[in-house]
Amino acid sequence: SCQKWMWLCDEERKCCEDMVCKLWCK
């Protein structure tokens, strides 16, 4: 899980949306 203010998740360029790390979310 992740927090809204977290942009990077893992080592990929992902962001946090709905407490989940996703690719290319806004």
From Swiss-Prot:
SUPFAM superfamilies: omega toxin-like (SSF57059)
A GO cellular component entry from the record: extracellular region
A GO molecular-function annotation: toxin activity
Tissue: Expressed by the venom gland.
Alphabetical UniProt keywords: Cardiotoxin, Disulfide bond, Ion channel impairing toxin, Neurotoxin, Secreted, Toxin, Voltage-gated sodium channel impairing toxin
Positions of disulphide bridges: C2-C16, C9-C21, C15-C25
Domain of life: Eukaryota
Compartment list: Secreted
Record function comment: Gating-modifier toxin that non-selectively inhibits voltage-gated sodium channel Nav by shifting the threshold for channel activation to more positive potentials. This toxin moderately inhibits human Nav1.2/SCN2A (IC(50)=404 nM), Nav1.5/SCN5A (IC(50)=218 nM) and Nav1.7/SCN9A (IC(50)=333 nM). Inhibition of Nav1.7 is voltage-dependent, with lower inhibition at more positive test pulses.
Entry similarity comment: Belongs to the neurotoxin 30 (phrixotoxin) family.
Domain writeup: The presence of a 'disulfide through disulfide knot' structurally defines this protein as a knottin.
Protein name: Mu-theraphotoxin-Phlo2a
Organism: Phlogius sp.
